Design a protein with these regions (language model features):
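Short, polar loop motifs at secondary-structure junctions
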Residues: 58-63
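Short, surface-exposed ligand- or partner-binding patches at beta-edge/loop junctions that are enriched
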Residues: 99
Length: 139
């Protein structure tokens, strides 16, 4: 009986594995720290629909100059003093859609900003994932 039940559970688990969303289309996942991570398409769609949204690129100035999302503001997360000074001037009533190169810096920025009372969303995989999906950048 146990073998039948385990086999049934395994079959159900395997059959649902292929039901995940296409790359770039999944919407939300929240790691244990509560930061909401959005796939690139969901990220930009939600940012466009959100009248309080601000796109925030937390890469270096050099990286930003090489290409960024249209309309994004830049604050360098790797320069802690400048980053802290920059976020101290931001409006906490706005919603911030944050990205970096691959997702590590943006996640750290989201954690820091969320602790300070900002509403934030992180883009999954950063601009590398964005461009891999053929989505446009501005120079």
């Amino acid at each position: 009986m146990k073998k039948i039940l385990l086999s049934l559970l395994a079959a159900v688990g395997l059959s649902t594995t292929g039901c995940s969303a296409q790359a770039g289309q999944s919407s939300k996942s929240a790691p244990s720290d509560g930061i909401i991570v959005l796939a690139p398409q969901a990220f930009i769609d939600q940012a466009k629909a959100d009248t309080t949204s601000i796109l925030l690129d937390v890469r270096t100035s050099k990286e930003y100059a090489e290409g960024h999302l249209a309309g994004a503001q830049q604050l360098d997360y790797l320069n802690p003093e400048a980053f802290d000074a920059g976020i101290s001037k931001l409006d906490k009533s706005r919603t911030y859609y944050i990205y970096c190169r691959s997702g590590k810096r943006s996640h750290g920025a989201c954690q820091k900003m969320q602790k300070q009372g900002f509403k934030v969303y992180d883009m999954e995989g950063g601009i590398l994932n964005w461009t891999k999906l053929g989505m446009p950048v501005e120079i």
